[in-house]
Amino acid sequence: MSRSPAPATRAPDGAAPQPGRRYPLPTVGALIVSPRGRLLLIRTHKWGDRWGVPGGKVDWGESLLEAVHREVLEETGLTLEEVRWGPVQEAVLHPEFHRPAHFVLINVVARSHGEDVTLNDEAQAYAWCTPDEAEALDLNEPTRRLLAHYREHGLDTPPLTPPPVRGAARDGDA
């Protein structure tokens, strides 16, 4: 029995999804807490010039922990310690995102070693803020929910750990 492709869902503006993509894309994002207790936010065109957190796609064969360390280093130049679970969210054809997409947003809260940020070309600005100052910014919706999680739990969540077993990929693995 053959399966027909899932029907393409259109974004609110009528744009079609990425060709060939019929499944959600896993991403990681980090709310970073400095040694002074301030939170790092970045402003990006991808989210309608709203403020959010550094992060991006999880590469094939990469653990979530590896992905968050890589994305944060690429986008901010920061290294992380004490990486803790945050909320897992979904963004399905989110109107704030610049193109039709379906993301599974795997969020973490982590400490940085400092506040010396070097942005790459994905972000236009950054700010270290108190939670109250962060809430006053034009945050994208997923970041607003992540900030609410941080206000409730702080860094008091389980640590994100590497997978206990890593096997080799086999031909035909999806």
Model-predicted segments: where are they?
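Short, well-ordered beta-strand micro-motif
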Residues: 32, 107-111, 130
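Conserved beta-strand segments that form the floor/walls of ligand-binding pockets within enzyme
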Residues: 52, 107-109, 138
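Conserved Nudix-box catalytic region and its N-terminal flanking loop in Nudix hydrolases
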Residues: 37-75, 174
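NUDIX/MutT-family hydrolases
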Residues: 118-150
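Charged phosphate-binding loop/patch that engages nucleotide di/tri-phosphates or the phosphate backbone
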Residues: 144-174
